[in-house]
Amino acid sequence: MAELTNHFNKVNELLNDWDGVGLSHELSMTELITSILNSINHNSHSGMSNQKKQQIQAKVNQIKKTDLVVKRQQDIDTLCANKIQHNYNEIVAYRLRSISSLLDSKYYDAFRYLIEAINSFVKVFELWSQNILWRLSLDLRLMAELATLNVGSNDSNNSNNNVTIDYFEEASRTLLSKCFQAANADRTPNLAESKKNAALGVVNQLFQIYFKINNLKLCKNLIKTMESPGFPTLESYPLNQVITYRFFNGRLSVFNGQYKKAQEELLYAFNKCPNDSIKNKRLILLFLVPMQLEQCKFPKKSLLEKFKLTQFIDIVQSIKSGNIKQFNECLSTHQNFFISKGIYLILEKLKIIVYRNLFKKVHLITTGQRIPIGNFVSALKWMENDAIDIDETECILSNLIYNGYLKGYISHKVALVVSPTNPFPKLPLN
């Protein structure tokens, strides 16, 4: 009973002190859920310090010990009502029930109890407790991921095994209608005192779900709301939340073909991301590198090696040198990797830059403004395809001219006439 009593006393103490940060840690289920997720995914917290691993394991052990006591109680609701301050007793009770269900592999029940904990919390939510809102939002997303992984395998352990549920959809609905609305509905005129200061942490969890279920159109409405005059400026939110927000904003811009905006957002996220957050910086680079290559800005080999993105090394080299054959081979070799990260089509579009750099070399070794089309055909045959003909070559040249990578015009089947000044301009992003 001591473990549960200590938990109750700690919750009451933190409530009396209005310590939202401390209370969010005390009520956290993150360590337990991620521990189970990692065991399923065979992930051993690689890259995490031993001290951090020990802290996580200590938290998990504490939760398990407390749960053994909870399972011996006949009426946990009444016990919480008697031991916890009235406005938080339901939250604590539902959380304890969620943990018990989770440890019994009853993922549907665990998910439902966590939603009930959130429903109880938003009724008493105040700005000082925003860290709890963020923690509950994170735990709900992680719980949805865990429950989704176990659909069909452990559903028989649920209280209602006839239920079919889209956990991510249900989680996003709760986050939007309960958590985000709890922050958004505040009409306090002084934004510094408004619950809207808690909104960005919830929005970031929604972003992760929307990208997970490939429903990106829902992100636009959130961005429009967050950047409206009625909300605090982005700079007023915690930096780690701003980094996450701008990362997803950058990814959305990539998807929408807004490459200049994407580069700005992703570059901000990468530069502001702490240097010891190797995993996050690597994730940002996955999308930033293609945006930089679009502008012929080439990352150093040492940077790609540091973040274990060696798949890009030959891509960078082939674009620099205009080596179409090497570019195609690299795309083919690492196709599965690039597809799994959702960047294959973006990289494929860079082929036109490779053509540009190859044809620029042809121009440099040719005297005068009129370059025979045959010169380009020969270069392509040597680099890429013996079967390529003059019509295909003219098509490539036309695309280069149309997209602004080359200034000049084509004299059909005779020559390319290039501009006397800056025929291969520096690449602007769209």
UniProtKB/Swiss-Prot annotation:
MF term (GO), any: double-stranded DNA binding
Lineage of the species this protein comes from: Eukaryota, Amoebozoa, Evosea, Eumycetozoa, Dictyostelia
One BP annotation, GO: post-transcriptional tethering of RNA polymerase II gene DNA at nuclear periphery
SMART domains: PAM
InterPro entries in UniProt: Csn12-like, PCI_dom, WH-like_DNA-bd_sf
Gene3D superfamilies assigned to the protein according to its UniProt record, in alphabetical order: Winged helix-like DNA-binding domain superfamily/Winged helix DNA-binding domain
Any Gene Ontology CC annotation: transcription export complex 2
Native source species: Dictyostelium discoideum (Social amoeba)
Family to which the UniProt record says this protein belongs: Belongs to the CSN12 family.
Boundaries of every PCI domain copy: 243-424
Protein name: PCI domain-containing protein 2 homolog
